[in-house]
């Protein structure tokens, strides 16, 4: 055990608090750089979840849709644990059918 680990243990410091603060700051910066207001971001999140839920059952309690910034590039990241696919019958619209081969 290093001296720093001993002092941290003695003072019961939470090593994760610095990481949590860093993640929060990155989230704030991502929101600022993307120029998306919170209402629009929430609407996007709901719509993304709605579309994904049409095809697979997702665990909403464990899921997360967020903005992440790396090297001045902001990305919308959806981390959605999939429970199982939803059974669907394949429908082909008349306009999508292939023309008959001669």
From Swiss-Prot:
Any matching Pfam family: MinE
Keywords per UniProt: Cell cycle, Cell division
GO process annotations (BP): cell division; regulation of division septum assembly
Family of the protein in this entry: Belongs to the MinE family.
Alphabetical list of HAMAP family matching this protein: MinE
Purpose of the protein: Prevents the cell division inhibition by proteins MinC and MinD at internal division sites while permitting inhibition at polar sites. This ensures cell division at the proper site by restricting the formation of a division septum at the midpoint of the long axis of the cell.
Designated name of the protein: Cell division topological specificity factor
Provenance organism: Synechococcus sp. (strain CC9605)
Gene name per UniProt: minE
């Amino acid at each position: 055990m290093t001296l720093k680990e001993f002092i941290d243990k003695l003072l019961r410091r939470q090593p994760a608090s610095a990481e949590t603060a860093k993640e929060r700051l990155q989230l704030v910066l991502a929101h600022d750089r993307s120029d998306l207001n919170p209402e629009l971001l929430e609407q996007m999140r709901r719509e993304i979840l709605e579309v994904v839920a049409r095809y697979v059952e997702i665990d909403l309690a464990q899921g997360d849709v967020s903005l992440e910034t790396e090297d001045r590039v902001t990305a919308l990241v959806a981390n959605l644990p999939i429970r199982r696919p939803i059974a669907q019958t394949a429908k082909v619209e008349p306009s999508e059918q292939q023309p008959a081969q001669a």
